[in-house]
Amino acid sequence: YDTLIFAAGILGSYTYMLCGGIFCNAQTGNIVLLGIALGTRSWTSALYYVIPISAYALGAFISELIPDDVKHRFHIRWETILVAVEIVFGALPASTPVQVFQVSINFIASMQYNTFRNSEGVPMATTFATNHVRQLGIGLAKELHRRHGDTSHRRVIKRHFSMVLFFLAGTILGAVACIFLGRRAVWVAVLPYAIVFAAFLHADLTSEKEWLERDPAGH
């Protein structure tokens, strides 16, 4: 999960810096910008923000419909197939139109968020950091008021803190890559996705082969 949110951080920097100032990891920012455009009667700008929002909604829609059919056809879990799809989109040629990157990255970010929902029983978001920051605050409050000897919440604090750090590291790397590589910076996200895909595929074919029928929620 750290690797997934690291890759999402790279894509977040890429779409904001090189794809017209849009946010791919979550849609709150895009909806705010849409509202501003509508309020200022900037109709063309409003339409510009409708596109990534619609792509994000479509990603969630698709990720709810097709996992069962796909995993039975290929005999590996939907999570593994999704990461393979993310690699394909991440490896698009640098000459690909910006609009295609906008739609595709928002689309796969939505599917990733909707698919990878928890890690070892801890609810997780693998495309943005807001929930992890909130959970850190909750965890620190529990630490302040914890009962003597009860440290069960500390594991959760560590997981969320790790996710925030990896997301931040991804955005930093993404920003640096955008400066030096330009449109080719998106390829940097392929490596962490490839690592995750290799681990997932190996698990599907060996130690977690019997987990095929489990609902998508992450490995």
Language-model regions: role of each:
Residues 1-219:
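Alpha-helical transmembrane segments of multi-pass membrane proteins
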